[in-house]
Amino acid sequence: MNKTILALAISMMASGAAVAGGDFGLEVQNLLRAQSFKFFGVVKPLTASETVSVSRAPGQTPKDLIKLAPGLNAEFVTRKAGQNSDQMAFWPNDIKPTHIITCIEDFRDPVDNVVGAYPNGQVKFGPSIQRVNLKTGAVETILRGLSSCDGIRRTPWNTIVATEERDDGGLYEILNPLAISELTVVTRGASDIIDSTGATVAGQVEYRGAVGKLAWEGLDLSQQGVVYYGDEERPGSGGANADGGSLFKFVPSTVWDGTVVTSLSQSPLVAGNVYAYQASCQNRTSSSFPQFGQGCEIGEGAWVKVDPANLRTSADANSATGFYRPEDGHFDPLYTGSGVKFCWTNTGNAGAKNYGEVNCVMDTNPVGTGEVTIDNPAVNAHGLTYLADSAEAKGFAVAAANRMVEGDTDLNQPDNLAFQPVTGNMYVIEDNPFGDVWACLRDSNDRDIKTDGCVKILSVRDGSAEPTGFTFSGDGKTAYVHVQHSSDTACVDGSDCANNDGYPTDDLVKITGFKINGK
């Protein structure tokens, strides 16, 4: 708990202030709400989620569609983003972006997701990746032919990577998202790309098979080119006793050295190995480390090698730790320790009273120092290969995962995640009807290792929609969010929310008014 809040709580009790029903926890919760301007830069948080649905319609303002904490303002960037617009990345940087590059989470379907044909008769799929001009709101399609494009990031070497949330989903890398338009992936899982005339286009988009196939969502990439990501899989969905999705990392064969990438052949994503986090029931110096099994979900663990051709099956077979639908994930920008701190959401199922969580893993040596294979029939890791770290006593690369945010009856089913620059506050976005966006404090110098508290700052007013892709620009004072998959019944031809290029639309909203240190 933040020391300021604790001191205030003690002061109020000492002065005889009544704590309703003796509920100290509720009083602390209310104290945080009362100081929301100091800690979150908003006048005050929302007290409740929206409950009365407001359908999408022509002529609306953003505040017709989202309920905002007092002090925040909103405007449409565009009402013409492709329906099912999901995560987004700024281009060419976070500080002064000119465009947002977005994923469209729709299936590749030769019947249901065809919006027409090009002049040469070639099938025109719905959009998969679009760019939005932040000055004009103009929306242009970069790429078609993916299935359920979801996670998207700008890499440290200034390319764009986009991923598919399908069981056999892949990752595709784009050299320059402003230099190409109306390209199509001929076959998923390959780098065969054509333009609107049917001509082959080489060197602009590459499928990255080395990172593997799985149901992608969030990811982050280190300066060296190490990629962290999860598999959005519910436990039991793959059959009896099947684990939930695992947490993976790709370690490139050649790390990025900071050289400007002018060709996709120079990307560190060309080749490498994939490992899955395997929580251990024993500490890193134990003679039985890594010792794994049911009940070991957090704490110190090792990185077991898996087969990128089928990551989910391989992770299960090699006893990687499973979670309940790992979804979005990002590095903590204020982490100052060795390596990286990667935080990700596990959505859970509120209907089953599994309210979800946000976990963070600290990985001190992301690249490792080669591999080590266990040859000891007396331990349950016999025959498995792991990422090595020669600086560790047992020789294994070790990461430590713990829970940062635990869901409850109000904050639950976390889906997306964002860190606010400057403050490092974590924003948690729900996957719910009338979904909320929560702002969560960092952990301070108290006893626990969890957030010091969360407040609600946004609630979607359309019960058919959800907030997604929430992210901050580099100054931490401006946020963007998609109001995804609204019912568009009222958006008739010619209206501001009508179809765009033969495809239904979503709203991209810009939110301003966040204060940092009172400014």
Regions found by a protein language model. Name each.
Residues 21-519:
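Sequence/structural signature of beta-propeller domains
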Residues 1-20:
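Gram-negative bacterial Sec-dependent N-terminal signal peptides
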